[in-house]
């Protein structure tokens, strides 16, 4: 079967012996364009089988099958006997012989044998045989003018490699020319196969043919499909590769040779006159193509593709109902291509043939209405056994197939031949495309080796880190390749820092928005994109002289803790040799004690915070996190460099106190893992001696001496919870160090070594560079702990930068930080989701780069952090997934990558906040106080409200000019907007952008009683987070978002869970941003985002439209409402003209006012603009659009109008009642559960304010 047919979805022939009849799609005949044309063949289907359709439309110019004057066709080399073909074949009668009705030139004719005529041994049923013309016999028709015709070389002449399909050839190889290899089954054989392929010579006219085996018997000479052809057809011969039953054989008849009669079941295009000499007809099912006379008059309309066959056979003989046209005859002098794409032939059913129709009927256009009942027979005859054609395109120029046709064949078919080959190669490329995609991840996995050399860059002198900021901006590519860095990080740390080598993968551009989403298997590739890029790149050095300053810590909003001014001693920049890698901030506090970050490699003081009694932490015991040594190989897989942090603190009150650390990195000294835990005296405040950071080549996880307690959960250096050797209550999953153990918590964790958003002035990005900290000059920055706490929502892990979900450690931690810090991320991972309150040095000069120091804000409320046990209980459970996703989306499961880190560290390939920072982002902007200023113009680049393993892409780089909207949303549903969020640019209130997995802030329950657990982030939630990001960005244009676009850009392979993900995204929008996703077009599934919190009067859409445009919109909406909810366009324009606004102006305040109203507002769905029916010329009217219904209300508009007129809204009683009714309905609608409102309540809207 031709490959062309395979492209169309047809079944391919059996690979071995012929099988029972297979019914495939009908023959598609290709109508060849003129030989001089390169246009592809035009497939056409025959008229319907009802045979009542007129063929008038199908008529084509009648080709004249005669050679140009004075030119005779070249003689053709006689063909030898092919193996195993039917009985003796008698040549057709000479041209001009007695033929009752001359057939149409170019029409395939099969003459039925007269009743009682001797039957030759029946060849394989369904074989189409055409006798070749005798050598020297005049061609029935010459090739198109200009076709070089030369005598084919004698059989056996070696043939050069045939030109590619479509290349005209001077002469075809003679039959029997050795061919190198035949094309695969289904390859159109329009062009001769390469030399070397043995070709059986078609038999010369009259050559007796061997008896074929019965139908279904495999034939000796034809190989099974896929093997080299034993008999590649000579040019002009249509031969199936295996001459199994149903093979078409075309042999040009020699002029003057008696025509072999076709079998009774043969499909006949012309009844043979009774006077024609009849030869022994071939067996049943053989289709004999007989050449018509050279200049036979046309008594029937030319069959332009529609088979005009008329069965003529004795009634006693069965005939095969021709279900498909046999050939399409092209216009004059162009090759006729018989394109059998998926032709299937089987032994024709024994259908008794009706009386022979008179030939005259063929002259009428409705030639399909042959009286013969055979034409109404079931469509079976030709659809039985699949024909495995090696040459699906047989091109001949005359019914008497001449061997000189190939030249035109190559000219005519080229359109056809180029067509199918592209089609055939097409599918293979398509099938090969997936492999390419599957190979993409390996490419990504190979990239990391380049980065393995990068860690040294990060473990270098402070100067290196000063260069990091630019590096961070260029992180995205580096991030994907970071994992290997982590794998070799500990060894690199133990070694002397190699010379800094700038990472080659420094991309200055940030990945575009949602396009940063990984490819469809994004979450599996994500593992390789979860590392802070800074570790891989070195940036230009920017030496800074950090001045010593004191930073008055501004009290955080929300639950607060007294925060005295913290003196920040100045520390000189580290010297390169002394620089050691200090992991990210890690805190450990006894249960009920404020978490105390202890690991800041710069000179920083952590001010102790006297918490208010209401928010006091009650230390009930001092459980510990015990770091169990891991196998060396496992530790090697873990990214964090091995850095021992010896706890030199003198102690701290077990409760209500945050420790103050002063860690000048330059004082790093070697200290063993046996750092003892000094007791924490109850001092109001104290200065801790410099912590000693040691990078030692000890075991990956050096056991440190901590106070052993009933730690509910232990952290592996990679940050996962492990079952404690003391407390064995954990499940077996918790006790495993296998990848399964790391797999579960990954999605649940929002860790990035300090990817905790901080104002730009705080140089938050640097805080995310754990490896770089050791090189940062310590600028005096103090961070007072903040007590602002946001309740966690079970189904929505907030996009706060530090929402540590899953195995985040709880307040049940050692009173001090004596354990060795193995992973800069593990440290952060061990933190519960408590707010980080960055309070940068406001007085630091611009020259000094703010040290990315963060203090783990001691959550003031007891419920601010979940216990380690609680937090880890869910962390070890695999994230919830739909069954379908679980089966299909294995790449979405949190799996252990080659470094032993869970994907949580580098779960998303999207831009990280540090990737967007330039050098200026790392500098304190000015002495102005920006300690809590999340509205800082450059803050968006320094923070990311969704920074989590699964949401780092959501808002990083997506924040608008003001990031407050991206941050204020992460208060829990019950938290007010004012809870620690300041939207004024100069605000000194630290913004708390984190959610604590705990009960609401109002609860005073202790941690033991707090059972709220952070749930793992399922793949659907990850997609929902990405969808939220996508929607927020798309909403800036105020244009509805199509569901199909969401699926294409974000959901991808999760389109089956599309509605579920959209609902989750809607819930996140409501909880986080106060927005709501509404479906405004249920037919096209278009969505918009509205402000669910409602707008204050006069502030309807001012956030998106400037005041003038907003006023114009309100005027138009109010006019529409007052005029009966529908106003003609001219009335609105006239009204605006009376107000002094000429809509024809294009340079006014609104620019093109008419375009603004009729296009922009309409596109944004504030207005609906429709034509008034039956108006000529067309007139249009305006109505409220769906967005107007959702974002405002009639009552608001009425109040707006009343305010303009200085009246009471009730001055318009009718409109007031209408607006009031709408308000009541909205109130009723709002009373329903919000979950039911989801994203599919196109008409629900918030109550008016």
Curated annotation (Swiss-Prot):
<dbReference type="InterPro" id="IPR041899">
    <property type="entry name" value="MAGE_WH2"/>
</dbReference>
<feature type="compositionally biased region" description="Pro residues">
    <location>
        <begin position="349"/>
        <end position="358"/>
    </location>
</feature>
<feature type="region of interest" description="Disordered">
    <location>
        <begin position="300"/>
        <end position="327"/>
    </location>
</feature>
<dbReference type="GO" id="GO:0005634">
    <property type="term" value="C:nucleus"/>
</dbReference>
<dbReference type="InterPro" id="IPR002190">
    <property type="entry name" value="MHD_dom"/>
</dbReference>
<keyword id="KW-0090">Biological rhythms</keyword>
<feature type="region of interest" description="Disordered">
    <location>
        <begin position="410"/>
        <end position="433"/>
    </location>
</feature>
<feature type="region of interest" description="Disordered">
    <location>
        <begin position="647"/>
        <end position="679"/>
    </location>
</feature>
<keyword id="KW-0550">Obesity</keyword>
<dbReference type="GO" id="GO:0005768">
    <property type="term" value="C:endosome"/>
</dbReference>
<dbReference type="GO" id="GO:0005829">
    <property type="term" value="C:cytosol"/>
</dbReference>
<comment type="subunit">
    <text>Part of a complex consisting of MAGEL2, TRIM27 and USP7; directly interacts with USP7. Interacts with TRIM27. Interacts with VPS35; leading to recruitment at retromer-containing endosomes. Interacts with BMAL1 and PER2.</text>
</comment>
<keyword id="KW-0539">Nucleus</keyword>
<feature type="compositionally biased region" description="Polar residues">
    <location>
        <begin position="1"/>
        <end position="10"/>
    </location>
</feature>
<feature type="region of interest" description="Disordered">
    <location>
        <begin position="134"/>
        <end position="233"/>
    </location>
</feature>
<dbReference type="GO" id="GO:0004842">
    <property type="term" value="F:ubiquitin-protein transferase activity"/>
</dbReference>
<feature type="compositionally biased region" description="Pro residues">
    <location>
        <begin position="410"/>
        <end position="432"/>
    </location>
</feature>
<feature type="region of interest" description="Disordered">
    <location>
        <begin position="862"/>
        <end position="910"/>
    </location>
</feature>
<dbReference type="GO" id="GO:0042147">
    <property type="term" value="P:retrograde transport, endosome to Golgi"/>
</dbReference>
<feature type="compositionally biased region" description="Low complexity">
    <location>
        <begin position="525"/>
        <end position="552"/>
    </location>
</feature>
<feature type="compositionally biased region" description="Pro residues">
    <location>
        <begin position="40"/>
        <end position="49"/>
    </location>
</feature>
<feature type="region of interest" description="Disordered">
    <location>
        <begin position="1"/>
        <end position="50"/>
    </location>
</feature>
<feature type="compositionally biased region" description="Low complexity">
    <location>
        <begin position="662"/>
        <end position="675"/>
    </location>
</feature>
<keyword id="KW-0963">Cytoplasm</keyword>
<feature type="compositionally biased region" description="Basic residues">
    <location>
        <begin position="881"/>
        <end position="891"/>
    </location>
</feature>
<dbReference type="InterPro" id="IPR041898">
    <property type="entry name" value="MAGE_WH1"/>
</dbReference>
<dbReference type="GO" id="GO:0000122">
    <property type="term" value="P:negative regulation of transcription by RNA polymerase II"/>
</dbReference>
<comment type="function">
    <text>Probably enhances ubiquitin ligase activity of RING-type zinc finger-containing E3 ubiquitin-protein ligases, possibly through recruitment and/or stabilization of the Ubl-conjugating enzyme (E2) at the E3:substrate complex. Acts as a regulator of retrograde transport via its interaction with VPS35. Recruited to retromer-containing endosomes and promotes the formation of 'Lys-63'-linked polyubiquitin chains at 'Lys-220' of WASHC1 together with TRIM27, leading to promote endosomal F-actin assembly.</text>
</comment>
<keyword id="KW-0813">Transport</keyword>
<feature type="region of interest" description="Disordered">
    <location>
        <begin position="349"/>
        <end position="378"/>
    </location>
</feature>
<dbReference type="GO" id="GO:0045892">
    <property type="term" value="P:negative regulation of DNA-templated transcription"/>
</dbReference>
<dbReference type="GO" id="GO:0070534">
    <property type="term" value="P:protein K63-linked ubiquitination"/>
</dbReference>
<keyword id="KW-1268">Autism spectrum disorder</keyword>
<keyword id="KW-0967">Endosome</keyword>
<keyword id="KW-0805">Transcription regulation</keyword>
<feature type="compositionally biased region" description="Pro residues">
    <location>
        <begin position="312"/>
        <end position="324"/>
    </location>
</feature>
<feature type="region of interest" description="Disordered">
    <location>
        <begin position="515"/>
        <end position="569"/>
    </location>
</feature>
<dbReference type="GO" id="GO:0005769">
    <property type="term" value="C:early endosome"/>
</dbReference>
<dbReference type="Pfam" id="PF01454">
    <property type="entry name" value="MAGE"/>
</dbReference>
<dbReference type="InterPro" id="IPR037445">
    <property type="entry name" value="MAGE"/>
</dbReference>
<feature type="region of interest" description="Disordered">
    <location>
        <begin position="1226"/>
        <end position="1249"/>
    </location>
</feature>
<keyword id="KW-0678">Repressor</keyword>
């Amino acid at each position: 079967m031709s490959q062309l047919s395979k492209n169309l979805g047809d079944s391919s022939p059996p690979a071995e012996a012929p099988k029972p009849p297979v019914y495939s799609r009908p023959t598609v005949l290709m109508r060849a364009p003129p030989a001089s044309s390169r246009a592809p063949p035009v497939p056409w289907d025959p008229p319907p089988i009802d045979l009542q359709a007129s063929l008038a439309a199908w008529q084509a110019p009648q080709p004249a099958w005669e050679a140009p004057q004075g030119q005779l066709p070249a003689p053709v080399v006689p063909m030898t006997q092919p193996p195993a073909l039917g009985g003796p074949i008698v040549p057709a009668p000479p041209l001009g012989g007695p033929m009752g009705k001359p057939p149409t030139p170019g029409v395939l004719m099969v003459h039925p044998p007269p009743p009682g005529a001797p039957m030759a041994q029946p060849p394989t049923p369904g074989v189409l045989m055409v006798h070749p013309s005798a050598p020297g016999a005049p061609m029935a028709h010459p090739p198109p003018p200009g076709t070089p015709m030369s005598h084919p070389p004698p059989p056996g002449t070696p043939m050069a490699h045939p030109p590619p399909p479509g290349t005209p050839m001077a002469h075809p190889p003679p039959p029997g020319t050795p061919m190198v290899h035949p094309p695969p089954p289904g390859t159109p054989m329009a062009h001769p196969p390469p030399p070397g392929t043995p070709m059986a010579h078609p038999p010369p006219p009259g050559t007796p043919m061997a008896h074929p085996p019965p139908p279904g018997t495999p034939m000796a000479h034809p190989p099974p499909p896929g093997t080299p052809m034993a008999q590649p057809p000579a040019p002009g011969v249509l031969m199936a590769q295996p001459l199994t039953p149903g093979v078409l054989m075309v042999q040009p008849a020699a002029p003057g040779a008696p025509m072999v009669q076709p079998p009774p079941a043969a499909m006949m295009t012309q009844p043979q006159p009774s006077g024609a000499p009849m030869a022994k007809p071939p067996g049943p099912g053989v289709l004999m193509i007989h050449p018509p006379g050279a200049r036979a008059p046309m008594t029937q309309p030319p069959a332009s593709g529609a088979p005009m066959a008329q069965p003529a056979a004795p009634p006693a003989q069965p005939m095969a109902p021709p279900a498909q046209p046999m050939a399409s005859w092209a216009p004059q002098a162009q090759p006729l291509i018989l394109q059998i794409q998926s032709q299937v032939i089987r032994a024709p059913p024994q259908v008794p043939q009706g009386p022979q129709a008179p030939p005259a009927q063929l002259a009428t256009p409705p030639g399909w209405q042959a009286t013969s009942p055979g034409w109404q027979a079931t469509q079976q005859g030709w659809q039985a056994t699949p024909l495995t054609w090696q040459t699906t395109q047989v091109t001949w120029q005359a019914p008497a197939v001449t061997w000189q046709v190939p030249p035109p064949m190559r000219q005519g078919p080229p359109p056809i031949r180029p067509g199918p080959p592209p089609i055939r190669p097409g599918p293979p490329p398509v099938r090969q495309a997936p492999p390419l995609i599957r190979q993409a991840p390996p490419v990504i996995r190979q990239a990391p080796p380049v980065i393995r050399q990068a860690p040294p860059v990060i473990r270098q002198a402070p100067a290196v880190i000063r260069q990091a900021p630019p590096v961070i901006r260029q992180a995205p590519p580096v991030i994907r390749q970071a994992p290997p860095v982590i794998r070799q990080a500990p060894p690199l740390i133990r070694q002397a820092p190699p010379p800094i080598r700038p990472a080659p993968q420094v991309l200055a551009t940030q990945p575009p928005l949602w396009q940063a989403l990984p490819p469809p298997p994004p979450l599996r590739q994500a593992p390789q994109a979860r590392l802070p890029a800074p570790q891989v790149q070195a940036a230009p050095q920017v030496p800074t002289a950090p001045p010593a300053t004191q930073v008055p810590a501004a009290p955080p909003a929300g639950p607060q803790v007294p925060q005295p001014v913290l003196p920040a001693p100045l520390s000189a920049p580290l010297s390169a040799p002394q620089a050691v890698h200090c992991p990210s901030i890690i805190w450990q506090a006894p249960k009920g004690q404020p978490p105390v970050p202890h690991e800041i490699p710069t000179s920083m003081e952590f001010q102790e915070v006297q918490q208010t009694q209401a928010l006091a932490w009650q230390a009930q015991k001092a459980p510990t996190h015990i770091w169990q040594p891991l196998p060396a190989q496992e530790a090697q897989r873990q990214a964090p460099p091995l850095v021992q942090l010896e706890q030199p603190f003198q102690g701290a009150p077990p409760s209500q106190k945050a420790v103050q650390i002063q860690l000048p990195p330059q004082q790093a000294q070697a200290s063993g893992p046996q750092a003892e835990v000094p007791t924490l005296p109850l001092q109001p405040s104290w200065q801790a001696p410099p912590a000693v950071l040691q990078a030692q080549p000890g075991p990956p996880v050096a056991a440190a001496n901590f106070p052993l307690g009933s730690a509910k959960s232990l952290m592996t250096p990679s940050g996962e919870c492990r079952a404690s050797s003391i407390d064995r209550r954990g499940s077996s999953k918790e006790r495993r160090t296998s990848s399964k153990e790391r797999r579960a918590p990954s999605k649940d964790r929002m860790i990035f070594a300090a990817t905790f958003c901080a104002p730009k002035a705080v140089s938050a990005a640097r805080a995310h560079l754990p490896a770089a900290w050791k090189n940062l000059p310590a600028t005096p920055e103090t961070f007072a702990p903040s007590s602002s706490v946001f309740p966690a929502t079970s189904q929505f892990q907030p996009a706060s930068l530090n929402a540590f979900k899953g195995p985040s450690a709880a307040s049940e931690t050692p009173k001090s930080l004596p354990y060795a810090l193995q992973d800069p991320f593990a440290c952060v991972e061990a933190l519960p989701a408590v707010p980080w309150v960055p309070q940068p040095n406001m007085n630091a000069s611009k020259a000094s780069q703010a040290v990315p120091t963060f203090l783990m804000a001691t959550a003031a409320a007891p419920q601010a952090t979940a216990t380690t046990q609680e937090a880890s209980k869910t962390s070890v459970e695999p994230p919830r997934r739909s069954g379908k996703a679980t089966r299909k989306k294995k790449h979405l499961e949190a799996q252990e990558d080659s470094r032993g880190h869970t994907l949580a560290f580098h779960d998303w390939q999207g831009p990280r906040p540090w990737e967007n920072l330039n050098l200026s982002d790392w500098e304190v902007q000015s002495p102005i106080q920006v300690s809590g200023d999340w509205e800082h113009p450059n803050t968006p680049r320094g923070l990311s409200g969704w920074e989590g393993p699964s949401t780092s892409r959501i808002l990083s780089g997506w924040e608008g000019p003001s990031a407050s909207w991206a941050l204020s949303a992460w208060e829990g549903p019950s938290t007010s907007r004012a809870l620690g969020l300041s939207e004024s640019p100069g605000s000194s209130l630290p913004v708390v952008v984190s959610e604590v997995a705990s009960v609401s802030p109002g609860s005073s329950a202790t941690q033991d009683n707090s059972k709220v657990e952070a749930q793992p982030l399922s793949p659907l939630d990850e997609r929902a987070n990405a969808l939220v990001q996508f929607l927020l960005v798309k909403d800036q244009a105020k244009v509805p978002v199509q569901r199909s676009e969401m699926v294409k850009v974000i959901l991808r392979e999760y389109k089956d869970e599309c509605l579920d993900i959209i609902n989750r995204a809607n819930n996140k929008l409501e909880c986080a941003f106060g927005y709501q996703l509404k479906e405004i077009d249920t037919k096209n599934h278009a969505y918009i985002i509205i402000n669910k919190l409602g707008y204050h009067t006069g502030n309807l859409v001012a956030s998106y439209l400037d005041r003038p445009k907003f006023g114009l919109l309100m005027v138009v909406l109010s006019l529409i409402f007052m005029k009966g909810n529908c106003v003609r366009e001219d009335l609105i324009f006239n009204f605006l003209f009376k107000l002094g606004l000429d809509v024809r102006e294009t340079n006014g305040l609104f620019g093109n006012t008419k375009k603004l109203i009729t296009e922009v507002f309409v596109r944004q769905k504030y207005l609906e603009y429709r034509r008034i029916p039956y108006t000529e010329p067309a007139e249009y009217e305006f109505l409220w659009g769906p967005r107007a219904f959702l974002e405002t209300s009639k009552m608001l508009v009425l109040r707006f109008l009343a305010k303009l007129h200085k009246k009471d809204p009730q001055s318009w009683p009718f409109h007031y009642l209408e607006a009031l009714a709408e308000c009541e309905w909205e109130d009723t609608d709002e009373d329903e559960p919000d979950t039911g409102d989801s994203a599919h309540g196109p008409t629900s809207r918030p109550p008016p304010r």
